[in-house]
Amino acid sequence: MGTFTLHQGQSNLIKSFFRNYYLNAELGLPNDMELREFALQPFGSDTYIRHLSFSSSEELRDYLVNRNLPLHLFYSSARYQLPSARDMEEKAWMGSDLLFDIDADHICKLRSIRFCPVCGNAITSEKCERDNVETLEYVEMTSECIKRGLEEARNLVEILEDDFGLKPKVYFSGNRGFHVQVDCYGDCALLDSDERKEIAEYVMGVGVPSYPGGSESAPGWVGRKNRGINGVTIDGQVTIDVKRLIRIPNSLHGKSGLIVKEVTNLDDFEFNEALSPFTGYTIFLPYISIETEVLSRNIKLNRGVPIKIESSIGIYLHLKNLGEVKAYVR
């Protein structure tokens, strides 16, 4: 099968955008980073580089910029005595933060298109027989769907604060949803997978009875049920996993070019170009003709017709497989 390589991170221009970002980025690193495993997916690779350990932000920055530029960048929710050990038992687990993952595409039905990047035809299979290349898929992420994900995050925060007395932090994932994280120490950090499963099922509303006739302002599930909240849509496997990798706050998501960003005020969050660090303009060459919503804007593309567009939008479109960024214009 032919290989079509000018997409997702294989462009040298996209790499230069990412490298310039990481030269000065203030990554949100834990204060015990020497106990965390770091991992990344480099440009041009489908596999992860794991079992990395760093003792300072400067050491990490040097590695990212000069050795392995990341398309995706993570650290472990777990703390380890030897985070760089390749054997998981040898790492010696010391406890983990508590994680929740909300994917907007699990909440909404999103429009998706599979197409050939050479001829531009819509194709349902993974290969275009005519051009002998792999097809690409584009999934449209709408602001309305992101809003629904944000509402799930709001409900989750309420449960964790009111019912468990925890102090969760909410992060935009950089692509299609939200991560909710509780920095855990002591007993919280030592919760095993079964105990975390109980928490996951609780916030999802598993086994919670109905409370007909209750007050909407009542505390706990009585009030939630009477406000129409039956549970939070999370990926339970993320919460159960005590050795999960977390996207590093203020890193870039390799499928969008957007920043993994803490949302300190849920009421102020907007899914728009402000989530991108990139300025100036790009020349973008579309693979297909399409009208689509991009970061809360309606964008019209014509196959093979280059357009000058904001870098935030052009890089997003490139990483979403809709075409190529051909040039940067200040």
From Swiss-Prot:
It comes from the Archaea. Its cofactor is Mg(2+); Mn(2+). Its EC number is 2.7.7.-. The keyword 4Fe-4S does not apply. It is an enzyme of class 2 (transferase). GO terms for biological process: DNA replication, synthesis of primer. Pfam families: DNA_primase_S (PF01896), PriS_C (PF20873). One of its GO terms (cellular component) is primosome complex. Zn(2+) binds at residues 116, 119, 128, 131. InterPro entries: DNA_primase_S (IPR002755), DNA_primase_ssu_euk/arc (IPR014052), DNA_primase_ssu_PriS (IPR023639). The keyword Magnesium applies. Catalytic subunit of DNA primase, an RNA polymerase that catalyzes the synthesis of short RNA molecules used as primers for DNA polymerase during DNA replication. The small subunit contains the primase catalytic core and has DNA synthesis activity on its own. Binding to the large subunit stabilizes and modulates the activity, increasing the rate of DNA synthesis while decreasing the length of the DNA fragments, and conferring RNA synthesis capability. The DNA polymerase activity may enable DNA primase to also catalyze primer extension after primer synthesis. May also play a role in DNA repair. Belongs to the eukaryotic-type primase small subunit family. This is DNA primase small subunit PriS. It comes from Saccharolobus islandicus (strain L.S.2.15 / Lassen #1) (Sulfolobus islandicus). The gene is priS.
